[in-house]
Swiss-Prot record:
Reaction catalysed by this enzyme: dUMP + (6R)-5,10-methylene-5,6,7,8-tetrahydrofolate = 7,8-dihydrofolate + dTMP
Main location: cytoplasm
Binding residues for dUMP: R22, R180, S181, C182, D183, N191, H221, I222, Y223
Name of this chain's protein: Thymidylate synthase
Superkingdom of origin organism: Bacteria
Record flagged with keyword Methyltransferase: yes
Keywords per UniProt: Cytoplasm, Methyltransferase, Nucleotide biosynthesis, Transferase
Origin organism lineage: Bacteria, Pseudomonadati, Pseudomonadota, Gammaproteobacteria, Vibrionales
Binding sites annotated in the UniProt record for (6R)-5,10-methylene-5,6,7,8-tetrahydrofolate: D183, S282
Similarity comment: family membership: Belongs to the thymidylate synthase family. Bacterial-type ThyA subfamily.
InterPro entries on file: Thymidate_synth/dCMP_Mease, Thymidate_synth/dCMP_Mease_dom, Thymidate_synth/dCMP_Mease_sf, Thymidylate_synthase, Thymidylate_synthase_AS
Pfam families attached to this UniProt entry: Thymidylat_synt
SUPFAM superfamilies for the chain: Thymidylate synthase/dCMP hydroxymethylase
């Protein structure tokens, strides 16, 4: 929590007001933020200064792992995070590539599991990474990226947290995740849970020990309609100790994540938190 709160305070104190054309709102903004999560010692980075709905964040990550491209599939997993971007984003609603209600297009997990090649075939980036790591191989290119500028017009949203690089040192697996843009009051709560959980899951299914997860954010911002709640409410609260994430040990391989795993296979213990805060969401 300390590094999260320090980032929030840094934005409040040092941020610059930037007009965001997509949302027609101003954002208090800083550039370059680095967070580190201790997965080895199960220090789960769940926000305690407000109630956090961690299951929705992990459900979204599971949808990415499965390569889902439809908001209905995410809802079936237990998260509504894609409903607004799929169905209320005016630019996407007017996009001729949109296939209909709940369609997200070629975003996030679609790119991670089915990156289009010029010859019409596809690359399964995640499969390659898992196969290599399972064999103890780190080719210095164990990279999962969702950032495909050539297909931005085929999806409802450019990826915010866009690239994950796995590094194997001995039998310990580390992760570095890159995020171009972060809505700190709302998005970071989800994003840091996903960075942590992605390393924990990939380490588990490849038989490696989890190490550290490094979360690198380029543009960290607070929307103008979120500022008072963050500054005058959340930042006045005393944080609690970090909880622990429990993952079903029966999850052994990528196919398990693709097929039978549900939110019932995850639990959080020792989670103390303050009351929820309803921050505005900008589409």
């Amino acid at each position: 929590m300390k590094q999260y709160l320090e980032l929030c305070q840094r934005i409040v104190d040092d941020g610059v007001w930037i007009e965001n054309k997509r949302t027609n709102k101003r954002c208090l903004t800083v550039v370059n933020a680095d967070l580190t999560f201790d997965v080895a010692n199960n220090q789960f980075p769940l926000i305690t200064t407000r109630k956090s709905f961690w299951k929705s964040a992990i459900a979204e990550l599971l949808g990415y792992i499965r390569g889902y491209d439809n908001a209905a599939d995410f809802r079936a997993l237990g998260t509504k995070t894609w409903d607004m971007n799929a169905n209320d984003n005016l630019a996407w609603l007017n996009n001729p590539h949109r296939k209909g209600e709940d369609d997200m297009g070629r975003v996030y997990g679609v790119q991670g599991r089915s990156w289009q090649k010029p010859d019409g075939s596809t690359i399964d980036q995640l499969r390659k990474i898992v196969d290599n790591l399972s064999e103890g191989i780190d080719d210095r290119g164990e990279i999962l990226t969702f950032y495909n500028p050539g297909e931005f017009d085929l999806g409802c949203l450019r990826p915010c947290m866009h690239t994950h690089t796995f590094s194997l040192l001995g039998d310990t697996l580390h992760l570095t995740s890159y995020q171009r843009s972060c809505d700190v009051p709302l998005g970071l709560n989800f994003n840091q849970v996903q960075v942590y959980t992605l390393l924990a899951l990939v380490a588990q299914i490849t038989g490696k020990k989890p190490g550290l997860a490094y979360h690198k954010i380029i543009n960290a911002h607070i929307y103008e309609d979120q500022l008072s709640l963050l500054r005058d409410v959340q930042l006045t609260r005393t944080p609690f100790a970090a909880p622990k994430l429990i993952i079903n040990p029966k999850i052994k391989c990528l196919e398990d994540l693709e097929t039978w795993v549900t939110m019932d296979d995850f639990d959080v213990i020792g989670y103390e938190h303050h009351e929820a805060i309803k921050y505005p969401f900008s589409v």
